[in-house]
Amino acid sequence: MGRPGYVYIMASQRNGTIYLGATSDLPKRVHEHREGLIEGFTKKYGCKLLVWFEAYDDLQEARATELRMKNWNRQWKLKRIERMNPEWNDLWFEIVK
């Protein structure tokens, strides 16, 4: 087994633009998105709120889940967010405690 991994969703606002990603270091990666340190989609569309994440024992498993979820339609992703986080609260402070 390799290092742990995470699948996560960033959003611009409730029901706004969403971005799905995977990483081995969730706090670092979310910080990069929040501060606009990563050029690309999240910076362009202002996806700075961590609204959903899931931990995996292995980064490869997280990446496989990310790829599956990227093929999901938007409604399925929104349902996933709302099951864990119905108010679309920013979960940043939960991961940096």
Go through each PLM region and give its residues.
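A short, polar/charged loop-to-alpha-helix boundary motif
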Residues: 75-82
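GIY-YIG nuclease catalytic motif and its immediate N-terminal context
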Residues: 1-39, 43-55, 60-70, 84-97
